[in-house]
Each structure stands twice: as structure tokens, then as C-alpha cells.
């Protein structure tokens, strides 16, 4: 009988230890809002120079279709760790040499109208045989946002788009992007 009482005592002590830890009534941190700017959400690449192109000159077309992320309370209360992924729809064109390409994408963190940080990275796409259209999601992009009692993650915005050349940006604006 004393063995059972000792076992019950150990069990109760373990239950109390498992109850220790972060405040269970604390709310999850608020993440920044993601934005897509139409003029930066599309890219069309052509072979050869010139302002006009035929469909046979098309290397690839791509569109940012989603920006997703998550936040979690970190060890440092002055920083909010966030993970962001960018989802792209990519179409291979007839002028594409090979079946692989790197598409330059950017992620910018804004604070009001100010860009606080910008990260440019390449999303690699490899088209399998007989597949000319893919939806892919970038690897996680880790962000650490400075927060305080007066400034939450909701104070920030995240903008994703393609790192365009001046000609590509002009073409997007002309086409209504």
C-alpha cells in the first residue's frame, strides 16, 4: 500500500510540474499583414531584346499567388520571430532553354510607409518532363521583428513580389498591374 501512495505522490508532483511554464492565458502574438502590389506580383521573361515580343519568345511567366506566414512568441520579448513563405504559379514558355530556372523574388518588411528591410532571393523551379506549369512555395524566410509594449507585430507589413527590371515594371504598369 505504501508503494501505491508513493506512486500517487510522484504522479501528483509530475502533474504540477507539467502545469508550470508560460502563462496559459497569454495570447498568441499578432503577425504583420501581408500585401501584394499588382505591379510587382507578375513577371514575364522574353528571349531577345525589344519592346514587342511574340508568344514564341516567351521564356516564362510567373505570378505571386499567396504570401503566408506565422508568428510565435520567442525567447526574447523584444523580438517577434516570424516565418513567411511565398507561393508562385510559374508557366514555362517555348523559348525556355532547359527545364530549370531561378526566379528573383523579394520580401520587404514595412513600418507604415517606410521599408525597414528587404530580402531578395531566388526561387528555383525545375519542370519535370511534360509539365510546363507549376505551383511552388518558397522555403521559409525567417524574420525577427522588433516589438515592445507599444509596438506589436501588427504594426508591420510584409510585401512580396518579383525583383523586376525597370522594363518589366513598366510593362506590368502598362498592362494594368
Q: Could you say what each language-model-derived stretch is?
A:
Residues 66-71, 84-94, 107-113, 125-129, ...:
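Beta-strand elements of well-folded, non-transmembrane domains
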Amino acid at each position: 500500500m505504501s508503494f501505491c501512495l508513493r506512486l500517487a505522490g510522484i504522479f501528483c508532483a509530475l502533474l504540477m510540474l507539467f502545469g508550470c511554464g508560460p502563462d496559459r492565458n497569454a495570447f498568441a502574438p499578432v503577425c504583420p499583414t501581408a500585401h501584394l502590389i499588382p505591379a510587382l506580383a507578375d513577371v514575364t521573361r522574353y528571349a531577345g531584346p525589344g519592346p514587342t515580343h511574340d508568344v514564341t519568345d516567351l521564356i516564362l511567366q510567373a505570378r505571386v499567388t499567396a504570401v503566408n506566414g506565422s508568428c510565435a512568441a520567442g525567447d526574447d520579448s523584444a523580438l517577434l520571430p516570424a516565418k513567411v513563405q511565398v507561393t508562385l504559379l510559374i508557366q514555362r514558355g517555348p523559348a525556355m532553354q532547359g527545364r530549370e530556372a531561378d526566379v528573383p523574388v523579394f520580401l520587404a518588411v514595412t513600418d507604415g510607409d517606410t521599408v525597414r528591410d528587404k530580402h531578395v532571393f531566388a526561387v528555383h523551379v525545375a519542370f519535370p518532363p511534360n509539365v510546363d506549369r507549376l505551383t511552388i512555395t518558397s522555403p521559409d524566410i525567417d524574420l525577427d521583428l522588433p516589438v515592445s509594449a507599444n509596438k506589436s507585430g501588427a504594426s508591420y507589413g510584409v510585401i512580396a513580389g518579383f525583383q523586376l527590371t525597370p522594363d518589366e515594371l513598366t510593362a506590368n504598369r502598362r498592362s494594368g498591374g
